[in-house]
């Protein structure tokens, strides 16, 4: 039990007027540590008990069982709790040393599935930094959900269908060179895609031609299908090479095309429930009762189905296949209206499990303040960016530790980790400006800074030749150790908050705080001095490294033992 919960439970025993959760939320951290570790304001009880807050605080402080604390005192209208630091540090260190990387493992999920729709790049387009956010946020959430006891199912809902394939076929037939595409598939396909879009702005016949080729593709035309399959296969080879570099895996690559034969059922269900309404020749579902002004456009006047129809089919398929406890869509914030409509249509169809679906939205990545766009050729490609990050990491490692063994593997972990961490430390609803130099810096709130703190601790433990014993009692009571102990003790709550809010930045900020607290401790403490506290200090180092490594793992970032 963490200290806040302990205090709330002890207060609840003498204050039946308030629920324990309400007490928990009222607890404050005094600005001055001389006033205690946590304080409960008695103002909230003044009306109920019809007494002055000072009197309430004084009376309750007398009734609270002090055996769990160093002391409990009333100061004005507050009850101030001074924690038994030696006792709590002993408990926390024992828990981490005993559990190792399983420390803070929780069982909320009880093995139930969480479907995570993530990454989902478009076939025949390069994997850009714009796709990175969905990939790394989704991957981190998968680790977090597993830590909460769920079974994550990572789905790469590939953009492998749509009018853009009509455009690409037109471009390839006009200017394509098979040998060039085979040699550099994505580069060549991108050039064709950008060129055809530029021409389409002045030549309206291109759009019609593209629509015609896409209609052929929908009808199973041999030439169209073979070209589509070729574009898809070449793109996937390139994507998988990048996913390997990022250490990201998937459980399903069912993309948009997978649902082509599953949309008729959606239309039949909507018709059977009398939900389809005709509007200007199109078929729509009205959603005004859900506060959604625009109806969901299900089928256009020319009979073509739309993106939402496909997503309805995907939602039904995933519920039947995975029976998910949660279904998460890690997709940019610009799709917010679409996902509101999707959930509302499913609700109208009578599927209450739509309440278990969440759009995990995120802000844009910009470069020099400008929005990125594949169509306009203004794009930061991930592959060369990862290579440059690894090179920058390698240069810094060479300068700091030229004799390091396995430099290439460490540079890869630091370079890739830097890009991921920088993305994840940003509140997901906020965008960020892409700055590789800032990402790979060993100073500031960065991945390499946290990784370096972990590597530094491993170096200390190697020098001391120290491995903690699960049967030894370790404890510390000094102020700087206490700051670290409090953070380590808070780790289970941080995991739950990250999970509840679908917000990996909570975990990233925790990792930064823990690394900063340890570095402060390291600067002010002679850890290896041979005195009676040495093993206690080393046990704290061991616990800190264990939690730092696990926090980084939950972000999808490796923690090298040497840097």
Swiss-Prot record:
In this UniProt entry, which cysteines form S-S bonds? none
Q: Name one GO cellular component term.
A: cytoplasm
> Which reaction(s) are listed as its catalytic activity?
tRNA(Arg) + L-arginine + ATP = L-arginyl-tRNA(Arg) + AMP + diphosphate
Q: Does this entry carry the keyword Aminoacyl-tRNA synthetase?
A: yes
Pfam families tied to this protein: Arg_tRNA_synt_N, DALR_1, tRNA-synt_1d
Main localisation, per the record?
cytoplasm
Intracellular or extracellular location(s):
Cytoplasm
Motif annotated as 'HIGH' region, chain positions: 121-131
What the entry lists under InterPro entries is as follows: Arg-tRNA-ligase, Arg-tRNA-synth_N, Arg-tRNA-synth_N_sf, ArgRS_core, DALR_anticod-bd, Rossmann-like_a/b/a_fold, tRNAsynth_Ia_anticodon-bd
- EC numbers on record: 6.1.1.19
Gene Ontology molecular function terms on file: arginine-tRNA ligase activity; ATP binding
Which CDD domains is this protein grouped with? Anticodon_Ia_Arg (cd07956), ArgRS_core (cd00671)
The organism's place on the tree of life at top rank:
Bacteria
Entry keyword set: Aminoacyl-tRNA synthetase, ATP-binding, Cytoplasm, Ligase, Nucleotide-binding, Protein biosynthesis
Q: Which Gene3D superfamilies match?
A: Arginyl tRNA synthetase N-terminal domain, HUPs, Isoleucyl-tRNA Synthetase, Domain 1
Q: Which GO terms describe its biological process?
A: arginyl-tRNA aminoacylation
Family membership, please give it: Belongs to the class-I aminoacyl-tRNA synthetase family.
- Whom does it interact with, and what assembly results? Monomer.
Cite the PANTHER family for this sequence: ARGININE--TRNA LIGASE, CYTOPLASMIC, ARGINYL-TRNA SYNTHETASE
Under the heading NCBIfam families, the entry gives: argS
Name of the protein this chain belongs to: Arginine--tRNA ligase
**Origin species:** Streptococcus pyogenes serotype M18 (strain MGAS8232)
